[in-house]
């Protein structure tokens, strides 16, 4: 970690922003935190925040399809690594209801032993009903599932215990549950990380616009407000006429996506001063 931070910091003077990629948790949390402290340009770990923004946008539109209310939703996130923790923190910041984090050992609860720093931090602000148990227990009565974990962990029977479930199975190349299986279990909206299924949830929709907007106004950091504004702008690109259970996000190839996200980020930066 020390060498990585030192090297990036030394070359940072030559660049307008730093996009971190493929740094595993928990190292990524410390690397990003320390770089933000020593660099005067935006530092953005795409695997964390890019993924979180596009998931938030997808959830906003899945809510429009299902009629669910943000503050009343129970959202289960499986995979408490870089992406999962960032998704949980952003959704909590946006006002989504009860976020329940799960890892290989099941539901994460405040006071659990063996948590890394990122998991420990989110344990204090998630799982407000102090649930315990396995992933199947967490999904009972849940409104949404967000998977950033491993293939084939979720069954149709587990989905059937959800409430008009929103299922984002984003493990690649094989998702936590295949879309047809999730729908067989009664899922109302299904998304994956793959382009060969409807509703691809991919951070490629986010990071080009994030940096374009930040660089345009010479922002020194990517704030929580910018991330939220980007998620809302991305969601708003899908009109009421276009919106359906199989179309909750614009195509990653839509040329308007980057400019829309950039405009939202720049506007938020100006308003924040």
Where are these regions (language model features)?
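Glycine-rich phosphate/diphosphate-binding loop of Rossmann-like nucleotide-binding domains
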Residues: 45, 49, 53-146, 150
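Electropositive phosphate-/nucleotide-binding environments in soluble metabolic enzymes
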Residues: 1-5, 25-29, 49, 53, ...
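Adenosine-phosphate binding glycine-rich loop
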Residues: 46-47, 66, 171-272
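Short, ordered loop/turn segments at secondary-structure junctions
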Residues: 22-25, 46-49, 104-107, 150-151, ...
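Glycine/serine-rich phosphate-binding loop and adjoining beta1-alpha1 elements at the start
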Residues: 1-73, 262
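Rossmann-like adenosine-cofactor binding region
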Residues: 121-188, 194-196
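General beta-strand structural signal in soluble alpha/beta enzymes
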Residues: 19-22, 43-46, 77, 101, ...
